[in-house]
Amino acid sequence: MATLTEDDVLEQLEAQDNLFSFMKTAHSILLHGIRQFLPSLFVDNDEEIVEYAVKPLLAQSGPLDDIDVALRLIYALGKMDKWLYADITHFSQFWHYLNEQDETPGFADDITWDFISNVNSITCNATLYDALKAMKFADFAVWSEARFSGMVKTALTLAVTTTLKELTP
């Protein structure tokens, strides 16, 4: 499995022009990051254990191919901070929510604001989050949907890259 570089991640996310495709790509990138991280949980395994136990667990049809199951295992083993677990879970849940919608909201919609307001890697970055809040609740004459949407996309991109950096084994 090829490792994604930060440039690859930025390029893939920047290429997305709507929230649905962005979140689909982000979900895919985060799942890839988790798959890269999982083998580090199984340390000092001999060849037989790796072949008959670890590989089937990590296979695409294996139980750890589900992002939620893999996250729970990583968190339960104490290999992930609570904020990181919450952020990835939140991304996964929002992606599943968007996947079920007939009409996908945009970057500037209230449901998206509610989502990013609960992503720790965004809210803990005071400069970024304060700028987003100022833009979101600015006077109508100052507010620009295109500019705000761009800021939201940037914030979400930073959240994904921050999360991936934390998943380094």
Predicted features, each with a name:
Residues 1-169:
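Amphipathic alpha-helical interface elements
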